[in-house]
Amino acid sequence: QRLEQVARQANVTISHETKPVVIEGVSRLIDELIYNLASNAIRYNRPGGTVTLQCGTNDEGHPFLAVADTGIGIAPEEQGKVFERFYRVDKSRSKARGGTGLGLAIVKHAALYHHATLDLSSELGVGTTITVTFPIQQDEPFA
């Protein structure tokens, strides 16, 4: 609900492509992971753009969550840095975009906690997709 309001204000459409999937883990952390991915996708989108939330299982049977946007994209030289705390791709627009620079760092740590992998695919002016792929079965229980 929070995301829908933010998306409306930014004139961004949210769509869902979901299939039933079970992701083992701490639901609060997974919720934060999804929220931070989606809010970044909205924040760095363009008016009239789209954010697509996906979940399902990949070809190997691993559960995944993906957030794709039609936003500004991330330059190749910036892509390795976006999961660092307080890192901002476009520092000149920091005040206009809002946020703390912690969203994707939270995503990274939530993914690591769940033994998940992160994949970022982006093209300037086209958009970005971030996919979080979870293990099929956890080796050890979550604390």
Residue ranges and their predicted role:
Residues G48-G61:
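Short beta-strand/loop element within the Bergerat-fold HATPase_c
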Residues E4-H16:
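Short conserved segments within the C-terminal catalytic ATPase subdomain
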Residues I74-R88:
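Short conserved segment of the HATPase_c
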Residues T18, V22-G25:
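Conserved micro-motifs of the catalytic ATP-binding
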Residues A41-I42:
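Short helix-loop "hinge" at the ATP-lid/N-box region of the Bergerat-fold HATPase_c
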Residues Q5, I72-G73:
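Glycine-rich G1-box
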Residues H115-A116:
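Conserved glycine-rich
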